Structure formats: C-alpha cells, structure tokens
C-alpha cells in the first residue's frame, strides 16, 4: 500500500481541510460541505461554485511572500538591503545570490528574472498550486524549479511577467 493515495469525503469542512491535506497519503478531499444538497435542489449553482472556489483558495493559501529587487552588484544589493534595515528595522541577511531585508524584501546581487524584479507568492501545497494554475492556462518555466533534498518542489517561476515583474511560487 506504499503507493496508494486516498480521497476522504466524510467529515471534511473548511476548518479541517488543510489538516487532511497535510497527510502525504491524501491526494484530494471532497464532500457535501462544498456541494450542499439544498443548494443543488434549489439550482443555486453559483453558490456551489463560490463555495468550491473558497475551498480551493483555502487549500492553496496563496500569500505574498516577498518582493525581489534586481541590483547590479553585490555592493548595490547590500546597500539596498541596509537601507530597508535603517528605514524599517528589517534585519539585513546575506545569502548566496541575494540579501534579504526581513522576510519581505529580497535584493538580488545581479539582475535576475523580471524587468523590475520579482514577486514571490507562497502556497500551502506547491504541487497542487502548479496543477491548479496550469488548468487555468498559466505556464511555468520548469528550468527555474528548485527542489529540496527529498526532490520536493520548493519554488518555480511562471513564464512571462506581470507588470514588469517575474512571479514565482514558493512552498510555505
């Protein structure tokens, strides 16, 4: 049964959905809490659609993770991160390819993706988010994908830009 996955449908609701989905053997969840019998009987499919969309958004938990600024050099990146530290107290921390100022601002040491920089959006389940967004017609640049030691996807950029910014997903 090591390769078996389950889809529970009983006892699931908006408040416990994530706890079910956190278990690696659960592939999906369903249940009448999204498609209530009285709504079906009344033909209120717009309300069913709304509940289902809310469930998907709750599951994926999209949040702004950070904004990336493209600098032209290590010195410029360090100075930019230091400026945020002086302004707001966002502690500057140097990494391999960037500096972070707190958790909300990343300053790249050399220009990277995005004309103006990048925006990172975090999600509870990056693999599910990629599948969902691909179904909506969005594309990912898998050459940018980053994986952890267990080969789990941790980050990936979308193709293209939004408002001059590259956008990438990151696993919470």
Explain the meaning of each model-derived region.
Residues 49, 105-109, 134-172:
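Vicinal oxygen chelate
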Residues 19-20, 54, 132:
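Well-formed, non-transmembrane alpha-helical positions, independent of function
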Residues 25-48:
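Glycine-rich phosphate-binding active-site loops on the catalytic face of alpha/beta enzymes
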Residues 56-81, 114-121:
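N-terminal beta-strand motif that seeds the catalytic metal site of vicinal oxygen chelate
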Residues 1-3, 49-59:
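Alpha-helix-loop-beta-strand connector modules within alpha/beta enzyme cores
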Residues 1-2, 12-27:
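Catalytic cores of alpha/beta
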Residues 68-106, 128-135, 146-157:
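Core segments of cupin and vicinal oxygen chelate
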Residues 5-10, 27-31, 67, 119:
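Hydrophobic faces of well-ordered beta-strands that scaffold small-molecule active sites
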């Amino acid at each position: 049964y090591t390769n078996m996955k389950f889809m529970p449908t009983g006892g699931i609701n908006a408040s416990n959905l994530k706890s079910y989905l956190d278990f690696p053997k659960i592939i999906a969840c369903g249940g009448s809490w999204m498609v209530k019998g009285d709504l079906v009987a009344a033909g209120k499919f717009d309300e069913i659609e709304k509940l289902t969309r809310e469930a998907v958004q709750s599951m994926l938990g999209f949040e702004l993770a950070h904004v990336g600024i493209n600098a032209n050099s290590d010195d410029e990146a360090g100075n930019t991160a230091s400026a945020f530290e002086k302004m707001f107290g966002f502690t500057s921390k140097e990494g391999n390819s960037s500096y972070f100022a707190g958790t909300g601002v990343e300053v790249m040491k050399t220009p990277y993706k995005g004309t103006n920089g990048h925006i990172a959006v975090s999600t509870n389940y990056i693999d599910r988010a990629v599948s969902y967004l691909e179904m909506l017609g969005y594309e990912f640049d898998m050459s940018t994908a980053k994986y952890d030691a267990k080969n789990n996807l941790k980050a990936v950029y979308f193709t293209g830009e939004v408002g001059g910014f590259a956008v990438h997903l990151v696993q919470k």
